[in-house]
Amino acid sequence: MTSSGKVRIYELSKDLGLENKDVLDAAEKLSIAARSHSSSISETEAGKIRTLLKQGGSPVASAPAKPAPGKAILSVRKASSPAAPSMPSKPAAPAAAKPSPKPSAPSRPEAPLPLIVQKPVSRQAAPQKPVSRQSTPAAAAPAAAPSAPAPSAPTPRPKPTAPKASAPAPTASAPSAPPRPTSARPTPAPARPTGTSPVKRPGSEASSPRPTAPPTRPQPKAPVNRGAPARPAPKPELVGRPQPKRAAPGAPVRQIGQRPGVSPRPSGPPGQRANMPQRPAGSQRPGAPTRPGNAPSKPGQPRSGASSLELVGKPIRRDGSNDGAGGRSDGQGRPPGAPRPGAPRPGGMPGMRKPVAPGELMQLQKPNSRPSAPPPRRVDGTPVATRSGEAAAGGAKATPPVSRPTATPPAAPRRPGFRPGPGAGGQRRPGRPDWDDSAKLEALRSKSPQKQRQKVHIIGENDDALTAETGGFAGERQAMVLSASLARPSKPRTKHKPAPKPVAAIRKRRKETARQRQRRRAMELRAAREAKQVRPEMIVVPEDNLTVQELADMLSIESSEIIKSLFFKGVIATVTQTLDMPTIEAVAQEFGVPVLQDDVEEAAKKTVEMIEEKDHAHLIRRPPVVTVMGHVDHGKTSLLDAIRQARVAAGEAGGITQHIGAYQVEIQHNDSPQRLTFLDTPGHEAFTAMRARGTKVTDVAVLVVAADDGVRPQTLEAISHARAAEVPVVVAINKIDKEGASPDRVKQELSEQNLLAEDWGGDVVMVPVSALRGENIDKLLEMILLVTEVEDLQANPDRLAKGTVIEAHLDKAKGPVATLLVQNGTLRTGDVLAAGPVLGKVRAMVDDGGGRLKEAGPSCAVEALGFSEVPTAGDEFEVYPDEKSARAVVGDRASDARASRLAQQMASRRVSLTAMSGQAKEGELKELNLILKADVQGSVEAILGSLEQLPKDEVQVRVLLSAPGEVTETDVDLAAASGAVIVGFNTSMASGAKRAADANSVDVRDYDVIYKLLEDIQLAMEGLLEPELVEESLGEAEVRAVFTIGKSAVAGCYVTTGKLQRNCKVRVRRGKEIVFAGDLDSLRRNKDDVKDVATGFECGIGCDRFANWKDGDIVEGYKLVTQRRKLAT
């Protein structure tokens, strides 16, 4: 109970031991406003609900569901008969389903028992008299003896052959009905059964079949009920209103709560009406649903007044009042779920019905008397049986009598009678108008055009003549004769033509199927092709550009996928459009394929042949050059340390190699000393060019793979370099001593790259080693020498030297220093050489151990001093006989180098017009100016390449100067003038540079690990971006009451999630629409201003600029927080 003395629904349900839904249903029935289980109601209302639930049990079981306004509610109730207390509780359909001997009549397999549709209220009514419930028209014996007579043998009914062409009428049971001449009408039975002597009900199986209307039908014998006088076979006649709630067995039952009102008249022909059961042309199949509302009379069968249900009582109102005289109590012995044979089954479509006043329920009753001589009439929905004997009543058709079952099976329950209602004789209560002509017109439209049109009078469900025991026969005397032109006979013909429509559809489907077959085959072929295509591990891009189609072919995907990917990135591309390198990398990265530039692979190819023809006569064997490659942290330098017995890896910054290291090792092989030259390449992804240069000059590539990590991206790149240089590969599986090492897994992954181990049947040497413990190092060296012996490595030491610049840097004491690998000839001190556009004269040479050398033969790696400037790493050098010839070559190369360098600088500053305009709209073009100084040329290349990969959509990186060497005072002056940041990598500051930087407030950063350098540059770029505001959700509340205070309004809310804070941002959501967004100006709880309200508490919310609160509104609270922006990738 709340503090205000109210009770919540869930508390009440807990007290009563019921579900919340049951209590809510009871509250809804009592018109108590309760939205959910947490709604509050007063103690008085709670008491009403307790009383209702204690008296009637669960609302679901005690009361029908509350109807929508203007709809009647039907409830199915078990009827218990005082006259038949021993009636079984289960449905008696199996017992009642036994047909009388009727050989030719088709029977329905399952005939449900009649359905009593009524409101469960006590009725002040006279005792009802039971009559025989037969769905077949029984005119021969309106009154039956209490004992079941033996049925006479019926004449077999021939199967109808002529189909009907009429559409079903909404208020009639069949399109055509035989007319009933007055001369053929029998008089009512002199004595009717009383409520204590019920007549046994014949099996519904015999009356359920609905054959199609035959043009002629033989006259069957009419069975005579024992105890009733034999009478001539009368014509079928209407003994009650056409009842929308009754249909033949097998008809769909209207669900409880369905509106029994008049359905709107369909605009199209009957054959095209949606949501209406379509009857085949002429006949009703056994088991096929009949339109609810059709009369249950069968073709060719006389109708008995004692065997048909009628609406003879006034509709029962929900308030329990019973104005009419008809009413059947709940105690008539029918099982609760057993439907009556004439009731429509659930799921069926209701037919055309008349509107029912809100709160009314229909009641089915039987008449207790029949009019003596009603005028001829026609029951809608009964097929015409014969055309013989129609002389009476002006040529109207007469239905011959048929054999009717007179006895029920022994197990069939006795049906109690019904009480006669007042107004017997078919007198209509004065003051009630006839039903509208639309129903009559619809009934007339459904008639077959071949049949003679009859006078049709449609009696609605709610007509006051429901109180009449005859069900409105008296109203027929005022029936309106409709014009024949209103029948529109052409519409029913469409029901005969359902066949052409499927034919046309089939034809259309065949055409579509052919196209779909072609599409399906194309899709299957494409899917098979895609299944066969394996996505490559890496793609090589030639000339830094590809078209969309070429990229799709390389990635083994559809070009449309690439176009879609580019579209989501804001790039509109076609199949033939050329993509630049950054776009190609972005697309390939999305599909998980790394990209290798073709120029990098070209750098790994041996483009210059070091041995000329004149050298062939002087060739001798040279030591092999071995390049150690692999992924970062896989143990390359540690392996070289183990070979050289040195400790290089321990002294490297960050524990990673960032330069090419050249070492010479002398080992014993076959009792003779052998020399090996090792090049240690960096494994970081930024040093791709360095690895390519190392592979270009190598003779054997040693691929180091960690046994606990397997094949990684740089491993794949190293394999690509080795294949481009066409050098043999020796795999060293390192770290076999670590826990989790799996050499076999490494071999399996390498086999997927077409590197198959020798012990697996391949030709690739794979040696498991441990660099830290020194395991299998000798075996690895032996395998390297065996591989190089096969290669037959030779050179001419008696000529001028030729080779490659492995690395270059600027030493503040020594000047420009280059690491040279002599590949042919002998390099001596004092030689003049040209390394690309750089001229140099060798002043000194130093080996890897720091010792001075006078000369260096083939496969020797040395550091040379004496260059005019720092040469470019990767350039070939050649010694010339004199300085003049060397200067001529260098001059030509310098002009070319200058042009390419200018192009690179322009490319680094290039900004597209689209990007400039977009940034100009934001108010400022954001740029980060850098001056890059590094220790060696290779490091400058690596850093520039990594900077190119940073996203530049929002911030441009401009490298004003990049060179190896120290940071000088000139660099500081340039940075101060341009607002640049000086980035140094493994270098120092010259004298005066530090003082100049402090004086000009220039930011100078020095790094020794490339990871940290790139990370700080990216953070600096993000620092130029404006911070963004992000919504942070606080909570939600539901408006449950609105209070008006002056001109403003306050919403009484219940906080469902999170919490609400004063002065936070709120959105008011009504359904799916946001009706207000602004600030929460007032937040109160129990008339006290509070800062916040947590979940589960009620509060009052006020907004100065919003007062249109409504119950059920959702208030979302949030706040805006600033967040550092990231670079868009």
UniProtKB/Swiss-Prot annotation:
Stored SUPFAM superfamilies: Initiation factor IF2/eIF5b, domain 3 (SSF52156), P-loop containing nucleoside triphosphate hydrolases (SSF52540), Translation proteins (SSF50447)
Composition-biased stretches (Pro residues): 100-112, 148-161, 176-191, 211-221
InterPro entries: EF-G-like_DII, IF2_II, IF2_N, P-loop_NTPase, Small_GTP-bd, T_Tr_GTP-bd_dom, TF_IF2_bacterial-like, TIF_IF2
Location of this chain's protein in the cell: Cytoplasm
Start-end of Basic and acidic residues biased regions: 431-445
Residue intervals of the tr-type G domain: 621-793
Stretches for region G4: 734-737
GO cellular component: cytosol
Ranges of Basic residues composition bias in the record: 490-499, 506-515
Residues reported in the UniProt entry to bind GTP: 630-637, 680-684, 734-737
Alphabetized UniProt keyword annotations: Cytoplasm, GTP-binding, Initiation factor, Nucleotide-binding, Protein biosynthesis
Biased composition (Low complexity): 33-42, 56-99, 135-147, 162-175, 257-273
Region (Disordered): 33-462, 485-515
GO MF annotations in UniProt: GTP binding; GTPase activity; translation initiation factor activity
Region: G3, residue numbers: 680-683
Keyword Aminoacyl-tRNA synthetase annotated: no
Role noted for this protein: One of the essential components for the initiation of protein synthesis. Protects formylmethionyl-tRNA from spontaneous hydrolysis and promotes its binding to the 30S ribosomal subunits. Also involved in the hydrolysis of GTP during the formation of the 70S ribosomal complex.
Name of the featured protein: Translation initiation factor IF-2
The organism of origin for this protein: Synechococcus sp. (strain CC9311)
